[in-house]
Amino acid sequence: VVIAKDLTSDVVKKLEKGAKVLWLPTTSSHFVAADDTLSQSDNATPYTVGGLFQTDYWNYRMFKTICENNKKKVSPGTLGILTNPEHPIFKGFPTEMHTNWQWFPIIKESHPLVLDNFAKDYRPVVQVIDNIERNHKLGLVMEWKVGAGKLLICMSDLEKAAKYPEGRAFYESVLGYMQSDEFNPAAEITMDELKKKLAEKPRQVSLKELNNISQY
């Protein structure tokens, strides 16, 4: 398994020729396409969101406005994860379909990727649930066939997460899965398509108002 923080031209060539590549982007910067390399730029618009272990409290818009008015950091605003606990990637990392405490170090070091520009029927291995205001499709772990190779993207700094037993267990489980014959992504994508999707600005949702229609 080739482990990379950037998809350099050398890594891309190995991938397209049949290598298994684990891509671990380490910041929440936007990914920009440059020639045959996917790199990260601090000057580009971030198309990721922050990592948040606990469900965002109560009303994202209200607390977002309060934070902005007080020049405070706004919560990432996400609502936990959604995954298939029977997926072979979890053989060494037991999980439910939702967030639980073993996920804390992984999510704490994460920056989920906005997948709005990808195929509507594509589902990441680990999806992050967004709040109703943004309603982005967010991915923590994604996989594709690329050329003759196989690519797995994890939007968590697993080296930092590995300071904790849970983080190490997840990292080892990911690598064990990738080294096995069970690593066989159903979805396919070309490098050109991947570059284009990552470079496109995601859709923007504009809600005029949120109404409480309950009887409480």
Regions found by a protein language model. Name each.
Residues 2-52, 56-59, 145-155, 174-177:
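Short alpha-beta junction capping motif
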Residues 3, 134, 166, 170:
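Soluble or luminal CAZymes and related metallo-dependent hydrolases
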Residues 30, 55-165, 182-216:
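Catalytic beta-strand/loop cores that center a nucleophilic Ser/Cys/Thr
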Residues 167-179:
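Short amphipathic C-terminal alpha-helix that caps PH/PH-like domains
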Residues 40-41, 108, 169-172:
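Short, charged/polar low-complexity linear motifs in solvent-exposed/disordered segments
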Residues 16-17, 36-37, 104, 141, ...:
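Surface-exposed beta-strand edges and their flanking turn/coil or helix-capping segments
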